[in-house]
Amino acid sequence: MNGPMSRPVPVTGEDLDAELASSVEPLSALGQFNRAGILAAADIHVARALGRLGRDDDELVGLAVALAVRAPRVGHVLVDLSTIRETAVAGSEEETDPANLPWPSLGLWLERVKGSPLIAVGDDGPADRPLRLVGSRLYLDRYWQDEQDVAVDLTARSSAGAPEIDEAVLAEGLVRLYPLDSSGLQRQAATTVLHRLLTVIAGGPGTGKTTTVARVLALVAEQAVETGRPFPTVALVAPTGKAAARMAEAVHDEARRLDIREAVRGWLLSLDASTVHRLLGRRPGTATRFRYEGHNQLPYDVVVVDETSMMSLPLMARLVDAVRKDARLVLIGDQEQLASVEAGAVLGDIVGPAATTGRPPPHVYPPIGRCITVLQANYRFSGPLAELALAVRSGNGDAVMAVLDAGRSAGRNALEGDSNARWLDIDVATAQSESLEPVRSAVLTAQQLVADAAQAGDAPAALDALGRLRLLCAHREGPTGAGTWNSQAEQWLAGVGEGPPLEGGWYLGRPVIVTENDYGLGLFNGDTGVVIAEEESGLRAAFRRGAGVVSVSPARLGAVETAFAMTVHRAQGSEFDEVVVLLPRASSRVLTRELLYTAVTRARRSVVLVGTEESVRSAVDRPVARASGLTARLWG
């Protein structure tokens, strides 16, 4: 019978969390970990369900399983039972020291876990268990399999040589295409691409990682020209549509300038870029199954991945499975930036010890070391901004504060001055209007340039102006979140007659960011645009597409948000003339060294940190350490 009483009642995520939490006995060990905010009720629910299926009700095993379930949720690939007591971070509002929770002794814990029917022991243990223990590292089995697959694939590629090349052609090309490479590192990276099937090019912003792609590909193409072979097939990919578009743009811009044959130039200009998901051909209705995989591999001779730091371990596993074993794989990125929002810190794990040595001596380290080059020279910015980025990356709080103290700002002219790394020492969460006047002034000044160009219908000028300033936030919501600061910017604009006379949320000069890929419009998650006036069609949203501009009716845009401010995560892969970083309080768990470094290095010319010294030091002193076994597998 279908009637009002038979209709299902919608259950929200909060309802489900509350329901699961009510089933956790508060005085049990698991209940104490739940109250401390280390384990979510869902972690415990899954652990108990697995225990029932495996007929194992040992509470120590249940705790280990719940922590392994939790691990990917907070970015880890595994839980290391030998260190979790020191590395766990309590997440409740109660002042709970994780060290005071009822942790079992390691010896007893490992003994119980090894004896559980739920858990395979060792890399060669049974394949039919949901979890696997390797040493003290406990994995959900699929993450162990992904890590194993990536390690085996990259080790094999690093040990294999690429097809034979003409060394004389390469030598001449290196001199011609890298005339200013005083360190020799860019030439080293290019040589690796030609000689090996795996190349990793790492380094900070402005070190020439992306622009060197065109030169490397030109060298590969010149080998084909000299031997009469066709040009290689190439896939340029990145984790997001925005990063892919920037990669293609960089390759095309560089191709127009290079001293190369016209045939090679035309070939480079014909290359396009896509997201990794689109390259692999994601199957509808699933995030982990793709058209291309081990039994149906990609047809490309060279696969180049930019912004590799944003890739999760599962996605990297799918990619290496799909790339032909005789194809060249080139991974590019900054291992110090924010890692994927999902499990793993793949690029950092791969680079490993090479992060501090540039390239390890071949007689000391395994084959992976011969495939890695860490670029050092910065061509984008200098002065205090470069000093600040280096100090943050190094975790030197005193050096960070020394740079900021030299550029300390106060009063109405706080965002002016000679230093390109400045500091507005206020608590963002409670700041009053007067103390925020410097930020308000900067937003209004920058937006006036956008609005003037938008009113004139000059889309390129409006988009150029949009890249002059961006507010960056650690959070999406809350008093220091991007949502709050977008609203604040609109209020400031409304106060001077420039802001929303709102019509469905659209107004002249509104900056917007796309939040979902729209392949029909050719717009991708992370693309930014601006609303301009067009004589015949009224308001249009203008976006860059390659070297040109495309304008779209606002009615056709669904998944967009206002973008005076954005999260640091969303800003990855982008750069602006000036960024204003609005820091949360020191207690924020997302305030990390990697987040601050990523925020600071979005600036081309200058950065302003807005926040207290406590917040700055807290970020610098809180590096992200994601639990993983990939470095150990690759480097030994």
Q: What feature does the model see in each segment?
A:
Residues 179-195:
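N-terminal pre-P-loop "Q-motif" helix
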Residues 167-184:
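N-terminal pre-Walker A segment at the start of P-loop NTPase domains
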